[in-house]
Amino acid sequence: MKEIVRALEGYGPPKDKAAEQCGWQAGGALCPGGLCCSQYGWCANTPEYCGSGCQSQCDGGVGGEGGCVDLGCANTPEYCGSGCQSQCDGGVGGEGGCVDLGSIISRSTFEEMLKHRNNAACPAKGFYTYDAFISAAKAFPAFGTTGDVDTCKREIAAFFGQTSHATTGGWPTAPDGPYAWGYCHKEELNQASSYCSPSPAYPCAPGKKYYGRGPIQLSWNYGQCGQALGLDLLNNPDLVATDRVISFKAAIWFWMTPQFPKPSCHDVITGQWSPTGHDISAGRAPGYGVITNIINGGLECGRGWDARVEDRIGFYKRYCDMFGVGYGSNLDCYNQTPFGLG
């Protein structure tokens, strides 16, 4: 069940900031409000930040895919909601697109996908709820709403496929099959390691451990995640296992955030990631298998057949079938070199 999901620093820093804000310098964090992340890890929407070397969101939140209000353009709820003048789906909906995550995954579908999560034998009984998931997802407007309807559904299937494996309580002969037992756990079973790798920007708090918690079993990178969510997770890592909305937010943050040199899981499943020649040489082709490589490639990929990889695929296929969408290609990572190793 343990997942090792470790995230790995534009121009001069604002005078009131002491640490980089985004990009690889900040653990892959994105700038708030769609601002550009410069090559040096700072946020703004000027040409110096959004031009050469820009790491992410390089239209600065003012490009052609956002909704338009009287003071500018972006694709956040503040711009695309009340008072929006045009293109109010923010570039993620429209004809064949998906604006409302609730229209992609309904409460009844959520319950059927995770039908045994509240079994008396599950340590996470009563913790994971549909309302918490939907509430958390609102902090990430592009999650599950990017592309056409099939792409949106496939992203949700992939997200729950990976997180269900991370939290599974299933076994081969389990009632309704092993892939109906996702979200049975909320904390890593082996909590002996502290998963502490201190740095000046993210010092480990005395007595705190950063083992796997929540749907994605977030490990190590509580500092980066907390910074992105506006929370002190270094001193309060248990929030990821005690606050159900924060738990889902942490998982979706990991899903949406590139981890240098890895792309984000979101960009892979929505077709926005294009492999480099180096990726192609390493066997990393677009598909669900690359997401497994992003999450736990160092332990599961490039080693031939692996039961853990098969388990991830099994959950994903079940959910795709429920949504009525195809699986895509390249589902495993058996012949992929892990990111960072080649």
Swiss-Prot record:
An MF annotation (GO) of this entry: chitin binding
Disulfide bonds: 22-37, 31-43, 36-80, 84-88, 122-184, 196-204, 301-333
InterPro entries: Chitin-bd_1, Endochitinase-like_sf, Glyco_hydro_19, Glyco_hydro_19_cat, Lysozyme-like_dom_sf
Keywords recorded for this protein, A-Z: Allergen, Chitin-binding, Disulfide bond, Plant defense, Signal
Residue stretches making up the Chitin-binding type-1 domain: 20-60
GO BP terms in the entry: carbohydrate metabolic process; cell wall macromolecule catabolic process; chitin catabolic process; defense response to fungus
Leader peptide range in chain numbering: 1-19
A family per Pfam: Chitin_bind_1
Function: Inactive chitinase-like protein that does not exhibit hydrolytic activity toward chitin. Binds strongly to chitin and possesses antifungal activity toward the fungal pathogen Altenaria alternata in plate assays. Probably involved in defense against fungal pathogens through a mechanism that only involves carbohydrate binding.
Family statement drawn from the similarity comment of this UniProt entry: Belongs to the glycosyl hydrolase 19 family. Chitinase class I subfamily.
Protein name: Inactive chitinase-like protein 2
Lineage: Eukaryota, Viridiplantae, Streptophyta, Embryophyta, Tracheophyta
